[in-house]
Amino acid sequence: MALRKATKEDVDHLSRRPLGLFTQTRIGAMPRVRRVRVGEEGGRKVCLFSVTAPASKAGSNTSATFDHFVAAAVELPERIEGRLAILRRGPLHSPRKPQFAEAKDGVDARVLDDYHVYASDPTLAAAVLDGALADWLVKDGHGAYYEIVHDLAVAYKGRNFMLTPRKSLLGRARALADRVPATAGS
């Protein structure tokens, strides 16, 4: 699989996706999508990218702090009507929380021990987070945040330096996409 530098249209299309990662920050600024690479693997579109989001301003408007994320996205085999965020619990780096409610009903308790789950529809969370996906999240899915948005599975993590292995995130996004139950889209 060879990834190529994204065109302006590719970046614009990705930036318009309703990912929690792209929501307006608490200081009213919009995150910026950067370093986008796109390609195809096994007949599905894949994408690697970085996001820089202003987190706070210093006393004068001349300085700000930023949250930095690296992410990978893989096209789902089947479209899902709705959005789901699976955000790992932990004190170190807070993810971009989506604008819908936390879902707990019908979600595997093992998943809830390790992750906060948010869904546009609570029944979607229960339908998606069972079986193989729940097992993978608990056993091998640690270390990243996940979102499923319509036809896209995204894995991302905060980064403090430029050397975060982006290809490993692509593997996580691919594993997530491969484990979403086919019946969840209906």
Label every model-predicted segment.
Residues 2-186:
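Charged, low-complexity intrinsically disordered regions
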